[in-house]
Amino acid sequence: MIAKLAPAAALLFALHVTPAGAAAQGTRVPAADPAAVVREGNARFTVLTDRLVRMEWSAKGAFEDSATLVVVNRRMAVPKFETARQDGWRVVTTDALTLRYKEGSGRFTADNLEVHLATGNVDATWRPGAASTGNLGGTIRTLDGVKGPVDMGPGLLSRDGWTLVDDSESPNLVGTGPAWVKARSADDDQDWYLLAYGHDYRAALGDWAKVSGPMPLPPHFAFGVWWSRYWAYTDQEEMDLVRDFERYGVPLDVLVVDMDWHNTFELRWGTSDRDAAGHTKGWTGYTWDKAYFPDPESFMSWVHHQGLRVTLNLHPASGIQPWEEQYPKVARDMGVDPATKEYVPFTIWDRHFAQVYFDDVIHPLERQGVDFWWLDWQQENTTGIPGLNPTIW
């Protein structure tokens, strides 16, 4: 089994409560040290650690040295390894594994590629297509609609002692300054990472963190007590709720304000009205409902004075509709005449839209007092860039 971890692997320990600008900084050099690279025809092998090897095959012999949405760093201290040709096979050996690839044999298959690992109390041989029967499971994008057991998909750790991460279709991250996402080449290339760690799971996580980038530490308040209920509270009812926590000596750290903070057009389950994006009208919204929150700045200031953080529910899929307070500015900044009432789609993969979205919509609300956002369901799981999930991005 090939672990299609995609961006979730790189974000293994990240939480939605971490502001986007607070990502931890660390070594991010996508091109590996040439001394770690072994080229064999249209195949390339990069020894990243003694337990982690990158395996690439390209029909054109054109290999990827840019960062991807999963892997941002390949420049690490070159581990001790040896390489040689033996009886028509390219052999790469580290202290933890021995890789063998049949010279000139084309795409990676079970007939031309194998990795023997003898580390962490595991002695096994991996080949492409091998089933990972001991995988411990991965992550799930959303729990909406889940009413029982759910398949979590493959994760980073396995009792088999190895994990294969397929990064062949992950979008690239390119550009100077803040990198941006770019569609991967349409060529049918293979770009795999094999972690051979035996039962040393800490080593597996450590090695993967080196290539996927440092994970931001969740803030202290994220581990506290949260209040969340899908209910149309007024600001006074929210304040009474907070006072009740104090009155009964129950700790509270985060106040979650569900979607009725914005205009919902009296949305109820079964509502059939659709917005211009084709979604149920009222799910997406950015304009305060003054019937419930007549003075949002004062309300959030009061919450902060109680020592709490406040988060607002957000369903972004419908973009910026013409009834939003922010619409005229967003439309102009996106080159749309506001008089047309043409909605602005949620094309978050477009760098210009993303800048406008944060400058004109998100950041002004944060200046009012929003600490972070609850990114809720509704958005699709595809974008205009293959392999890019809008929830993750």
Which residues does each predicted region cover?
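Bacterial N-terminal signal peptides
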Residues: 6-18
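Boundary at the C-terminal end of the N-terminal hydrophobic targeting segment
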Residues: 20-24
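Short, Gly/Pro- and small/polar-rich lid/capping loops
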Residues: 25-32
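Mature N-terminal segment immediately following signal peptide/propeptide cleavage
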Residues: 33-57
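A low-complexity, Ser/Thr/Gly/Pro-enriched, surface-exposed linker/loop concept
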Residues: 51-87
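Short, solvent-exposed loop/turn and secondary-structure capping segments
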Residues: 66-68, 102-104, 111-113, 166-168, ...
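Catalytic and substrate-binding clefts that recognize carbohydrates or anionic sugar/phosphate headgroups
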Residues: 84-222, 229-230, 242-247
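Aromatic- and carboxylate-enriched substrate-binding clefts and catalytic-loop regions
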Residues: 251-393
